[in-house]
């Protein structure tokens, strides 16, 4: 191993080259900061900065007194995977929608007229495009173009890849959607965590992230996962004013719960923004297996995405688009969405009420599938004790850009929660907290 360089960028690049060539294997230890600084004749802070960039890019990881080592393939948490649901545990961990509130995909695929396209055919179903344009036009008051991607995560990855390079800083919510953490780590981007409260991203935290050099912002306007927070009109205006001072920053709004959200959409993208996209996945209200998201974006951003989703290469299956179109145009599906909106709001609200009755405060009424509960005990210990009692939930640290954060929180998926379950779970969580308090004294 021969690390070279006199600047943080050069040192980090040297390590990356050796990792790519295989000279530095996963879990190989990097020299201590003091030792490498002496060998290279540079300040210790220069080496420390290089190592920090390697960690932020997912190339290396820190192990406390064990030093800094080359990272193995990232083991990233995902929705529904590794959620700790075993045996007879009640699943409040998966993050999934209620299957009974999803329409029949196979029936929709068989309806209407469908002609299998050949190479060179339009990449987007014309009728789906017409529907999407009308839907977006209700919320966007600036020129836009539409296209279809393989889901919201695919859209976010492609948008970041189209505008950013490895090592660029991206402002993301804290806590945030699991896939956002994975997208940044796998893409080699650095994260600038922006704290979230009941009204969404906090203006002071966004301002700090932009001052630190964030080149993109990923924001959830409503039904934020994991907290259930939604932007208020006032908060959206504050964020819009801040972003207006940074017109070149890429703004991605992930409106994943649009059709079944109980909250209105409040736009954070300012009129003068030159690079932006509004992404609306259909997974939460048409089904996770319908890998499709509708995207509205400025002309330049759309052109960059189209180059990566052109007919004949990586376009979204027209059969999937046909299925989505049939469902989105079906009045019966609209009625199902109205019912889903009502039931999801009722279930999450019921859980909040039952928790409050047990002395566990959730400071705002969430929207979406999940409820974020902050506790005054260790979240992992609470998750383990709840599992022993027959309840599966997810620990808060999984949703933090910095895994050391949100150690005292849990996320509870309330999508299928019944009233008896809400009552029982709240009592069990209160018992768990009391038991953990007693063992700590």
Language-model regions, residue ranges each:
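Hydrophobic residues in beta-strands of the RecA-like P-loop NTPase core, especially within AAA+ ATPase
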Residues: 172, 253-254
């Amino acid at each position: 191993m021969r690390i070279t360089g006199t600047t943080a960028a050069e040192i980090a690049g040297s390590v990356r080259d050796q990792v790519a060539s295989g000279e530095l294997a996963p879990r190989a230890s990097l020299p201590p900061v003091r030792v490498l600084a002496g060998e290279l004749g540079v300040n210790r802070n220069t080496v420390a900065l290089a190592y920090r960039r390697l960690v932020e890019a997912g190339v290396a990881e820190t192990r406390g007194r064990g030093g800094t080592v080359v990272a193995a393939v990232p083991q990233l948490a995902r929705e529904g995977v590794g959620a700790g649901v075993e045996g007879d545990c009640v699943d409040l961990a998966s993050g999934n929608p209620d299957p009974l509130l999803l329409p029949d995909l196979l029936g929709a695929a068989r309806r209407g007229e469908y002609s299998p396209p050949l190479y060179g055919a339009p990449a987007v179903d014309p009728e789906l495009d017409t529907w999407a344009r009308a839907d977006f036009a209700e919320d966007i008051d600036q020129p836009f173009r539409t296209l279809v991607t393989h889901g919201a995560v695919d859209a976010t990855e492609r948008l970041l890849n189209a505008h950013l390079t490895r090592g660029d800083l991206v402002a993301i919510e804290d806590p945030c959607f699991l896939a956002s953490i994975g997208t940044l780590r796998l893409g080699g981007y650095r994260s600038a965590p922006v704290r979230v409260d009941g009204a969404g991203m906090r203006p002071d935290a966004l301002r700090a992230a932009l001052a630190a050099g964030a080149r993109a912002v990923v924001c959830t306007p409503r039904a934020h996962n994991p907290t259930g927070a939604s932007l208020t009109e006032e908060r959206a205006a504050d964020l819009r004013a801040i972003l207006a001072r940074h017109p070149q920053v890429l703004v991605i709004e992930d409106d994943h719960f649009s059709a079944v959200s109980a909250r209105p959409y409040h736009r954070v993208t300012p009129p003068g923004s030159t690079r932006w996209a509004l992404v609306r996945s259909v997974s939460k209200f048409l089904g996770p297996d319908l890998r499709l998201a509708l995207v509205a974006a400025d002309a330049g951003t759309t052109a960059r995405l189209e180059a990566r989703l052109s007919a004949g290469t990586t376009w979204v299956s027209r059969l999937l688009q046909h299925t989505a179109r049939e469902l989105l145009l079906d009045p019966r599906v609209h009625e199902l969405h109205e019912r889903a909106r009502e039931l999801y709001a009722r279930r999450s609200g019921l859980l909040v009420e039952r928790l409050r009755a047990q002395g566990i405060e959730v400071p705002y009424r969430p929207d979406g599938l999940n409820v974020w509960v902050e506790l005054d005990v260790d979240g992992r210990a609470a998750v383990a004790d709840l599992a022993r009692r027959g309840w599966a939930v997810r620990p808060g640290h999984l949703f933090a850009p910095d895994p050391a954060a949100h150690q005292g929180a849990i996320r509870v998926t309330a999508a299928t929660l019944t009233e008896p379950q809400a009552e029982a779970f709240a009592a069990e969580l209160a018992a768990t907290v009391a038991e953990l308090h007693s063992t700590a004294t």
